């Protein structure tokens, strides 16, 4: 409870913010604006009352002093605090004070006609803008970012499950509708990509085995001369081949031995075995050791 001093005005009132009643106190000194400082849920609120009748306290008596009618309210908080709009002000001794619910603007003090003979407090220079009201240098992020919808069938493809075209419609000649077109297109592209990746890996392995480079110079010459064409013509077995490729290698590429040496069957190689002799400890070494 603020102790009233000589030539000062004090007011105790009850504010209603939302569903909670708040008991607040204010102190008006001479030559100052009438402001109410209250604490609500740990938040400091500084506001200017729209209209209030105050009582002047002197050592011997208390009498009605003035009735001020500022036109607007001022709400100020620290950064991160929420703004609370007071719905209703009620004086302890009776009577209600209404709010303007208006925009933020400097307070304007005008004397009430009944108290024209009383000199209202002089206005003080407006306080500089608080950090909460000052423009921020960093761009603010929107509270709700629009979530983009994924294309039909993409989530099923990314999950690593077996590829399958849409099961709707049921009959063979019924036209597709809705997202069936895009779903089947994405599944077809994923199946062709997996089969093509497997063919490309096999072709690259065969091309490397024809004449494997042994130096950086050989590697550079090999890369300039290498040309691989991939043909995907699995027909109605496209999904079956794509799913089989996925089971063999999750990334869709041909499986390679852990040691890095992938020995192909003799019939599939176009070089003489003497040019590329496998390591002595190779498991697939079938050369005559006698």
Swiss-Prot record:
Please name the InterPro entries in this protein's record. Herpes_UL49 (IPR006908)
Task: Extract one GO cellular component term from the record.
Answer: viral tegument
Motif Nuclear export signal per record, residues:
219-231
> Where is composition skewed (Low complexity) in this entry?
118-142
What Pfam families does the database record attribute to this sequence?
Answer: Herpes_UL49_2
Its biological purpose is as follows:
Tegument protein that plays different roles during the time course of infection. Participates in both the accumulation of viral mRNAs and viral protein translation at late time of infection. Modulates the RNase activity of the virion host shutoff protein UL41 probably to ensure necessary levels of key cellular mRNAs and proteins. Plays a role in microtubule reorganization that occurs after viral infection by stabilizing microtubule network.
Q: Which family does it belong to?
A: Belongs to the alphaherpesvirinae VP22 tegument protein family.
User: Protein name, please?
Assistant: Tegument protein VP22
């Amino acid at each position: 409870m603020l102790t009233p001093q000589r030539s000062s005005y004090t007011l105790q009132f009850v504010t209603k913010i939302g569903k909670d009643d708040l008991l607040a106190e204010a102190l008006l000194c001479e030559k100052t604006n009438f402001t109410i400082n209250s604490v609500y849920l740990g938040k400091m609120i500084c506001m200017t009352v729209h209209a209030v009748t105050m009582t002047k306290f002197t050592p011997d008596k208390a009498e009605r002093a003035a009735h001020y009618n500022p036109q607007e309210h001022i709400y100020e908080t620290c950064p991160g605090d929420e703004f609370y709009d007071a719905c209703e002000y009620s004086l302890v001794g009776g009577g209600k004070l209404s709010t303007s619910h208006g925009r933020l603007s400097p307070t304007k003090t005008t004397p009430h006609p009944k108290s024209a003979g009383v000199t209202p407090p002089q206005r003080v220079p407006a306080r500089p803008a608080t950090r909460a009201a000052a423009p921020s240098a960093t761009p603010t992020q929107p509270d709700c970012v629009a979530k983009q919808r994924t294309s039909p069938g993409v989530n099923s493809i990314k999950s690593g499950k077996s590829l399958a075209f849409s099961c709707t419609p049921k009959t063979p000649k019924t036209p597709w509708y809705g997202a069936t077109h895009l779903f089947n297109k994405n599944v077809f592209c994923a199946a062709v990509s997996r089969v093509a990746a497997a063919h490309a890996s096999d072709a690259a392995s065969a091309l490397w085995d024809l004449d494997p480079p042994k130096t950086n110079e050989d590697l550079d010459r090999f890369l300039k001369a290498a040309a691989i064409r991939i043909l995907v013509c699995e027909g109605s077995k496209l999904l079956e081949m794509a799913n089989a490729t996925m089971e063999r290698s999750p990334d869709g590429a041909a499986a390679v031995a852990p040691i890095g040496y992938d020995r192909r069957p003799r019939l599939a190689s176009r070089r003489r075995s003497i040019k590329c002799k496998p390591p002595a400890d190779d498991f697939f070494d079938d050369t005559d050791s006698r």
